[in-house]
Regions:
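Active-site-adjacent structural elements that line small-molecule/cofactor binding pockets in enzymes
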Residues: 2-297
């Protein structure tokens, strides 16, 4: 099966983010910025993915995004996310202006608060994020080029009212449904979802746990999962099988496509897939295997 015929999913030009030259498409690639090269970005573009999301706190000077934009012609580059505790908003706004001048309509700035456990300055993140958005927009970053990392209803509301939308991380489709209810019909909703190409469930879960497990020690993620009904038993250790199955799509390309489509059915506009492989493995063959099942090539 392919995803292309599975649902209508087009709210069209009523969406402010959709009226720009930027087109994300239904599926993009999420990958840690340190693992992305210009050659990989060009390969992702050739396969038909609409966006490349630079994860794990890419630098706010946006130099890498600019380099990747130079290496591609149509791919949207996005940050997921610039950490507001690590980069001053005035500097990020100036960097955004530089990138926008050189590559108009192809860059989406994702910002957020990161994790309490990883950031010494982390305090009152909602108020700090709202102020950060104030400074970015005063510095010329337009609302339709700004998205926020958001999990709970308060920050989702900020993403609805002050930005183009939200980019939730480590969420099942049930969260997407709740997030769309908070955002309403207009704003962009682009959740991240992990993927393992392996038809052996035990092996797939084992590989998925290598990426999920560290996040189960982070309060923002566990609090969000508890809001969704997951229990302490699910969240203990490296996560229950049911939790891993909800957070990591695995199986054949067709089976994975069906799992990712649940986000679209729940109200997402775009899904950022994070392919998990053995350390050091080239992800491009996996992207190539997934693209036809996702209706991309």
């Amino acid at each position: 099966m392919t995803v292309s015929g599975s649902r209508r999913h087009s709210r069209g030009a009523t969406e402010p983010w959709a009226s720009s030259p930027r087109r994300l498409g239904r599926f993009g690639i999420w990958r840690s910025a340190s693992l992305v090269t210009p050659e990989l970005a060009a390969g992702i573009e050739r396969l038909g993915f609409g966006a490349l999301w630079l994860g794990s706190s890419p630098a706010g000077d946006l130099a890498q995004a600019e380099e990747l934009l130079e290496a591609t012609t149509t791919l949207t580059l996005a940050t997921s996310i610039v950490n507001m505790w690590q980069d001053q908003p005035q500097d990020v706004a100036r960097s955004f202006a530089r990138v926008q001048r050189r590559h108009p309509g192809r860059f989406l700035l994702g910002v957020g608060a990161g994790h309490r456990e990883a950031t010494q300055q982390y305090a009152r993140p909602y108020q700090a994020l709202a102020r950060y958005v104030d400074v970015l927009q005063a510095g010329g970053v337009p609302r339709d080029s700004l998205v926020l990392a958001a999990l709970g209803p308060k920050v989702l509301g900020l993403a609805r009212d002050r930005a183009a939308g939200a980019i939730p991380y480590l969420v099942p489709p049930g969260h997407t449904r709740q997030a769309r209810a908070v955002l309403g019909p207009g704003p962009l909703l682009a959740p991240e979802h992990k993927v393992v190409l392996d038809t052996d469930p035990d092996q797939a879960r084992a590989l998925g746990r290598t990426t999920v497990h560290p996040h189960l020690g982070m309060v923002n993620y566990t609090s969000n999962l508890r809001r969704l009904g997951w229990t302490d038993d699910d969240l203990s250790g490296s996560g229950s099988d049911a939790l891993i199955d909800a957070l990591v799509a695995h199986g054949s390309p067709a089976e994975i496509a069906a799992q990712l489509t649940r986000h679209l059915d729940a109200g997402a506009d775009h899904v950022c897939l994070q392919l998990i492989t053995d350390e050091g493995a080239d992800p491009l063959p996996g992207y190539r295997a997934l693209a036809p099942a996702l209706g991309l090539s």
